[in-house]
Amino acid sequence: MQSGEFVILLDPIESSSGLTAPRFKYDAVIKTLNPFPPAFDAGKDSIINVCGAGEYNFNNNNLKGFVVSEESADKFLKTVYWLEMEGINFCFLGHISQALSPEIMEGLNGIDVLVFPAGGDPFLDQKTAVKLIKQIQPKIAIPTFYKVPGLKRKAEDVKKFLDEIDASKIEKTEKLTIKKKDIEDTKPTKIVVLTI
């Protein structure tokens, strides 16, 4: 994600995934799944590392983290994030595998862009993902964690989610530029599949 010259890396690709991580300079990293206690990018003091619950502000961007306590354990922490950037409200559901608690849902008002897992087990199943989209009613919903060439872990094709949601607006693109004025009147939710 980029706002001007400021770049945020969301859920960096692990080398064990079988995928090649993109190479670019970033200013902040947000991880929705962290070991506990958290491990940060060693030797990269200028990088902003975000982990866990709380309110953060960097480069005029407001971020709130909500720990998914029913899915966290002694050794790892799952967090859902709400980010306000350039007047647009984003929500990153990350590695969740079940519906969100009422407490977290209450903190996610006015979501413009929802980024959510859509590849099924071990994360959120497609039916629950569709229910969450209908509850949150974002202007844009972006599926993640689905099957792509080279991925070593189990995941289902994004087509399974697309069949489940039966959306009238679906866009496939390599890169997405979002401006507040362009999405203000977007209804129903537009599904955007980022391709690699």
Q: What do these predicted ranges mean?
A:
Residues Q2-N49, V67-F76, I96-G107:
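Pre-active-site segment of Zn-dependent metallo-hydrolases
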Residues V7-D11, N62-S69, V80, N89-H95, ...:
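Active-site-proximal beta-strand elements of phosphoester/diester hydrolases
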Residues K25-D27, D112, K139:
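Conserved acidic residues
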Residues N34-D45, L132, I136, R153-I170:
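Ligand-binding grooves and catalytic loops that recognize ribose/phosphate and carbohydrate rings
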Residues K75, I140-I196:
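Binuclear metal-ion centers of metallo-dependent hydrolases, dominated by the metallo-beta-lactamase
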